[in-house]
């Protein structure tokens, strides 16, 4: 190893010595300087050797090298935009609404036309819900009858308290304004009939009570009579017993008197028993008399409660039917413009949830609904700038729109042509394109191409990325 190093050192010293000697005589080795015309008289091979080289190729080489250096510096320092391209269309913002019927209906009248502007509250379309008008009239009639029944029971309830039939007077309410005279007469007749029936029942119970009271008086009179008779017969029996003790009369007379006394006592017991029975019957008659009024009152109050409940249900049903009819008259919620009118025949039938038209507020804005491919969605964020090019108007002549990413839907959508794509909403600043002094309005449904700026990258990285990708993939191969 030491020998090898010594040899290498001597080799370097040798070459150093040769270079030094050559450097000392370098000027002697230069060709003598000659004029241009002197070179022309030299032999051809010497002329070619002695003639200086032209500076033009050298300048071109310097220029090319400088250009390459400048291009390299610009490629390192220069930045280009990274753009994700997505196809889409112009749509209205979320405030545009579809008008749909709530149920199967018949088109009664078409008020508006396609593209017409209407103000808030203006009628757009009149429909007739199947059976809604008939249901409303039926419910109104049933509700009026229920209120008349309620009035009838209220009058009968007051008649029980006053024990006389009050005068029929309908309350001063709007729903009683159209009640016919025949209906009033029928109601009056029915009230009188019910009141008379109750009075007759009460009168019959009162007669029965009076009858029992009369029987009670008769029995009391007989009891009084036999009480007196029994005392007399008892006194006579005592007298006869005293005379028998003195042997003034026969024993047969005493036995006969005793028999009369026993008969009087037995009759007294019979009538007292009848009195107890009559007292019980009188008590029952009083209860029946009171029960007639109580039952009639309970019946009236129960009917009144049922009628009141029925009025509540019918009122809700009427409100529901009126709401159905009101929903059949479609009005503009705000000042809007009518678009996509799909109803053109009066008398035609529309079904539930069928789109009749689309209304767009006059101050509504357009936005872009674009489909972003799967490879680009990871680089798109809300707030990124975008350039919108409308296919109907070439951007080289009409320009383009400027917008920002408003919303990103991360649920993939299956597209037959593009595969899995993602829906991105881009808000735009203007609803028209400007060319010269003329504004071209845009409408929903126009096809557009959205170029979303996702970032910046250097030119050199852009140029080297295919090479880097190829090298990276090639190094992975077996």
Curated annotation (Swiss-Prot):
Residues 81-478 are periplasmic. Gene3D superfamilies: 2.40.30.170. It is found in: Cell inner membrane. Pfam families: HlyD_3 (PF13437). GO terms for biological process: killing of cells of another organism; protein secretion; transmembrane transport. Belongs to the membrane fusion protein (MFP) (TC 8.A.1) family. The keyword Membrane applies. The chain crosses the membrane at residues 60-80. It is a single-pass type II membrane protein. Residues 1-59 are cytoplasmic. The lineage of its organism: Bacteria, Pseudomonadati, Pseudomonadota, Gammaproteobacteria, Enterobacterales. Involved in the transport of hemolysin A. InterPro entries: MFP, Secretion_HlyD_CS, T1SS_HlyD. PROSITE patterns: HLYD_FAMILY. This is Hemolysin secretion protein D, plasmid. Keywords: Cell inner membrane, Cell membrane, Cytolysis, Hemolysis, Membrane, Plasmid, Signal-anchor, Transmembrane, Transmembrane helix, Transport.
